[in-house]
């Protein structure tokens, strides 16, 4: 995602923070409603977590696609409507005395706007063990589809027990010599279909009741220190890479001072309305039961529609 060379408005109707499926959907609806809108995105490429999804087979009308391609289609749609994008990370969101909003970017730019839509999604949760930070990008990865090709014919580990971890293990097994699937519990949490596929893949070895204590290597990962959660027994596990898939953390630091968060998530219904008038939310960052591409897209549409009827953004 390349930041546009453009003049910053004195005041926007709507600033959308994040260009995942929720943010892009909202941008399309806002532009079609003739709002003066801009999308802020901190990552080099938009699309949110969707770009890391190897296969998307439940998005209506596109039974055989992947998250990266779908994200590109979403972004192309928004750009075809001339939605402006700016590459900037949001440090703070605060309310002005007149009820409008001020957004401060890491670039130092201040964006004034009548309304805000938070669509920042969630980021990768970390293990918090020695070696994770120092070896990031040197064998430590959070995206199998991004980095898996670097480990062809090598032995790797995947940490986690949910759908993402199982999908990562299966994806890596196609090119790696061996894949260890490490989970802190006895039973996996992923869907039964994925569990069966993992069980039937000879290259995958499941290590239940196991945690990673340390990620080791001089310049690149060469082994892990793992421990049994029951006995506490530790041992070394030789691997060339580790793929961490232990969940997500909502990206809400920028609004923590203006919203009462629920375990980091923004409290809101499908209309995206928060406790703060003029501040809306959409996608995985809000409290909800189902976090998928289709629900994020719906959130974006719903929040902008509600915004049009409940705020002065269109005035």
Q: Where are the regions that the model predicts?
A:
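Conserved small/polar residues in nucleotide/adenosyl-binding loops
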Residues: 1-10, 309-315
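Glycine/Thr-rich phosphate-binding loops of Rossmann-like dinucleotide-binding domains
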Residues: 47-48, 113, 126-127, 166-167, ...
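Predominantly flavin-linked oxidoreductase catalytic cores and closely associated redox partners
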Residues: 109-112, 119-200, 206
């Amino acid at each position: 995602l390349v930041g546009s060379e453009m003049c910053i408005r004195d005041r926007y109707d709507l600033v959308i923070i994040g260009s995942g499926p929720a943010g892009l959907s909202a941008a399309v609806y806002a532009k079609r409603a003739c709002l003066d809108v801009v999308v802020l995105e901190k990552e080099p490429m938009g699309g949110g977590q969707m770009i890391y999804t190897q296969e998307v087979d439940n998005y209506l009308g596109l039974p055989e696609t992947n998250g990266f391609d779908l994200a590109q289609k979403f972004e192309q749609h928004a750009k075809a409507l001339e939605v402006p994008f700016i590459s900037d990370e949001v440090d703070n969101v605060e309310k002005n005395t007149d009820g409008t909003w001020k957004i401060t970017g890491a670039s130092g730019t201040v964006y004034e706007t009548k309304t805000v839509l938070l669509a920042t999604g969630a980021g990768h949760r970390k293990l918090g063990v020695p070696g994770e930070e120092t070896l990031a990008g040197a064998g430590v990865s959070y995206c199998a589809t991004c980095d898996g090709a670097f480990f062809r014919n090598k032995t790797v580990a995947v940490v986690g027990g949910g759908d993402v971890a199982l999908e990562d293990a299966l994806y890596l097994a196609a090119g790696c010599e061996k894949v260890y699937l490490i989970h802190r519990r006895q039973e996996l949490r992923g869907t039964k279909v994925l569990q069966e596929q993992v069980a039937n893949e000879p290259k995958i070895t499941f290590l239940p009741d196991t945690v990673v204590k340390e990620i080791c290597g001089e310049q690149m990962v060469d082994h892990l220190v793992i421990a049994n959660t029951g006995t506490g027994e530790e041992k070394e596990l030789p691997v060339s890479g580790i793929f961490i898939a232990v969940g997500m953390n909502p990206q809400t630091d920028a609004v923590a001072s203006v919203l009462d968060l629920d375990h980091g998530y923004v409290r809101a219904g499908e209309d995206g309305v928060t406790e703060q008038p003029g501040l809306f939310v959409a996608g995985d960052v809000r409290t909800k039961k189902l976090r998928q591409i289709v629900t994020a897209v719906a959130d974006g549409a719903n929040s902008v529609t509600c915004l049009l009827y409940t705020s002065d953004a269109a005035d």
